[in-house]
Amino acid sequence: MGCPSKGATGGGIVTTRVRLLVGTTKGLFSFESDAQRRDWTTSGPHLGGWEVYSALGDGHQGDRILTGTSHMAFGPSVRVSENGGGNWSQIPEGPSYSAESGFTLNRVWQIVPGHPSEPDTLFAGVEEAGLFVSRDRGATWAELDALTKHPTRAGWFPGAGGMCLHTILIHPDNPQRMWVGISAVGVFRTDDGGETWRTCNEGLARVPVGTPHPEVGYCVHKMVLNPDDPNTLYMQYHQGVFQSNDGAESWFPIENGLPGDRISAELGAPFGFPIAVSRSGDLFLFPLESSEQRTMRDGRLIVYGMRRGSDRWEPVGDVVPDEPRHVSVLRDALTIDSLEPYGVYFGTTSGEVFYSVDGGVAWDRMPGQFGRILCVKTWIQEDQDAA
């Protein structure tokens, strides 16, 4: 399956494959299409019975997929397939805290590639919150323990989903600068590759977690980087939606047009979990009913977007206008591919996967219904054949 086009070099034919990796509470599912993204094939469940909180299609090594998995009986692990999901094995030396640390590794929430200048590097964010690095494409892992040794560590407390490091962002021009998001602790930034870390939560309202450290106690749900300006970040927070224009030194609300926004003075700040940004700078998220209910407002599965250059959110798609959907979309279950026009994809807590290839105006549903969807990741593969 593929959409052929002339290659830029050698006169070959480049075939684009679009894969969607969907992690659920009962395994991983894979969807595949061509660049048109109209017809999809499905495979799975892979890793049946395992929770899959994170998934990464490793473009540096063929059909390699890495997953962060957990099981109520067997615990957490990183599992890898070298053939696109056909066979799986556990990485023996996966992320693991030392006995002396006093921490317990419960889940692997995030696996991301390192900076493009470091093709063998991977990072993993885990619960209890910590950051691990692999310099050999995932074969072995080491903790970047300056983060867990931060002076505020005694004041870290979990959110409702656990004390998880769920977001890892790398500056595109400077591999030494990274940001991480921890629930319900806050944002940290390093400017020296993880040797030291500083809190970056100015402008956010603390949540009542009882910590004596004023620098932490901030429940960041998800963050993304502006594709054109890496000093600009966007955040879905427990108590609103925020932007930073100074590398996370400070944050300010961007809620105009959202239900519950401060400008319209409706009760409560906009609550939600995921936020995603396209390569063109369009933003997408899902406002939920409230922190208490955590389901779609009035049972309507509506996607909100802020187009590049705008300062206002708009409802860009009523996904299932004729049916109620009292569901949620979790923090890592919304993603956007890198094609043009871009595709937007998300999965719900009731196990449905929806997608749009026109900027969120029209939506289709993938065939099938699955377990509670934990993560949705795109993987673009380009195969070049000889002319």
What are these regions (language model features)?
Residues 1-387:
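Extracellular glycan-interacting surfaces
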